[in-house]
Amino acid sequence: MVKPRLVFLSIAGPKDEQLYLEIIDPKEKHLLARYQYLGELSLDVINDLVNDGERTSNDCFLGLLGVEEDISTYAFYSNTKVKFILAVKAPDYVVKETEIRQLLRRIYTIHTHAVCNPFSMDLTPETLKTSIYFKESLHQLISDWNIH
């Protein structure tokens, strides 16, 4: 049985602008267009979920958005309307949503610390790409999760 592994992380701003996209496995960089497409599809699902008038839950974790072949996408929607999309490849393994929920909350915390840095005056989409704290913390979190 092949254990699950993270495929990509996408972070989108309040207006669905892409703030960050990280393809976890460097060998899959050639699949950038596919992962961008999955991220865009996920944004449509997120917007449908959060704009649903019947939605009663205030939980930021939106859960499983969809499955494309062997890649499952999950989402977290912050109170500032920042969207976190995480894709997991799990061909023969059931991924526990509680694990994904915890992982997305930790990513959200890392993101918050990076963009709320009082010493950084530059809060643009480049903030995450240039933040050493964000990159190192995220890479450590991802490597820990992939080997658990």
Curated annotation (Swiss-Prot):
<dbReference type="GO" id="GO:0030008">
    <property type="term" value="C:TRAPP complex"/>
</dbReference>
<dbReference type="GO" id="GO:1990071">
    <property type="term" value="C:TRAPPII protein complex"/>
</dbReference>
<protein>
    <recommendedName>
        <fullName>Uncharacterized protein C15A10.12c</fullName>
    </recommendedName>
</protein>
<dbReference type="GO" id="GO:1990070">
    <property type="term" value="C:TRAPPI protein complex"/>
</dbReference>
<dbReference type="GO" id="GO:0005634">
    <property type="term" value="C:nucleus"/>
</dbReference>
<dbReference type="GO" id="GO:0005737">
    <property type="term" value="C:cytoplasm"/>
</dbReference>
<dbReference type="InterPro" id="IPR006722">
    <property type="entry name" value="Sedlin"/>
</dbReference>
<dbReference type="InterPro" id="IPR011012">
    <property type="entry name" value="Longin-like_dom_sf"/>
</dbReference>
<dbReference type="Pfam" id="PF04628">
    <property type="entry name" value="Sedlin_N"/>
</dbReference>
<dbReference type="GO" id="GO:0006888">
    <property type="term" value="P:endoplasmic reticulum to Golgi vesicle-mediated transport"/>
</dbReference>
<dbReference type="GO" id="GO:0005829">
    <property type="term" value="C:cytosol"/>
</dbReference>
